[in-house]
Regions:
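A generic structural motif
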Residues: 62-69
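Sec-exported extracytoplasmic/periplasmic mature domains
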Residues: 47, 51, 72, 83-88
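N-terminal targeting signals for Sec/Tat export/insertion, comprising classic cleavable signal peptides
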Residues: 26-56
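Conserved short beta-strand edge segments in small beta-sheet-based binding/regulatory domains
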Residues: 86-98
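Short, low-order "capping/linker" segments at domain edges
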Residues: 100-111
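Bacterial Sec-dependent N-terminal signal peptides
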Residues: 1-24
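Helix N-cap motif at beta-to-alpha junctions
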Residues: 69-75
Length: 111
């Protein structure tokens, strides 16, 4: 009986030690958003990324808050997801072709 308890204890210990603790980070990305449509596009682009737990854009500050797992997605990948849908992301400029596809109200000078 003692052997069974010892083996079970060792087994549980190995399982517990084998699990990685995943870190979660929060990042704030400055965007070129202009309106509610921009907000929806930016939040969708970020939330679609694997590893993103939560993303929200504050239209007043044009700052996107993103909670994500760095082991699944990098900060650069998050920025690129915004660039690809037509928005600036910090110092990265929006893809000009993607900007052309945005509604007029979402393009620079649209409001």
């Amino acid at each position: 009986m003692k052997k069974i308890i010892l083996i079970a204890s060792l087994f549980i210990s190995f399982i517990t030690l084998g699990q990685k603790k995943q870190t979660i980070d929060t990042v704030y990305i400055r965007t070129s958003a202009l309106c509610g449509d921009c907000k929806e596009r930016i939040e969708s682009a970020l939330n679609f990324q694997k590893g993103v737990k939560y993303a929200e854009l504050n239209l007043e500050t044009k700052i996107a808050t993103c909670v994500y797992k760095p082991s699944k997605v990098s900060l650069n990948e998050l920025r690129l997801s915004l660039v690809r849908v037509g928005y600036d992301a910090d110092d990265m400029k929006a893809d000009p072709e993607a900007v052309k596809l945005l509604p007029k109200c979402c393009q620079p000078g649209g409001h």
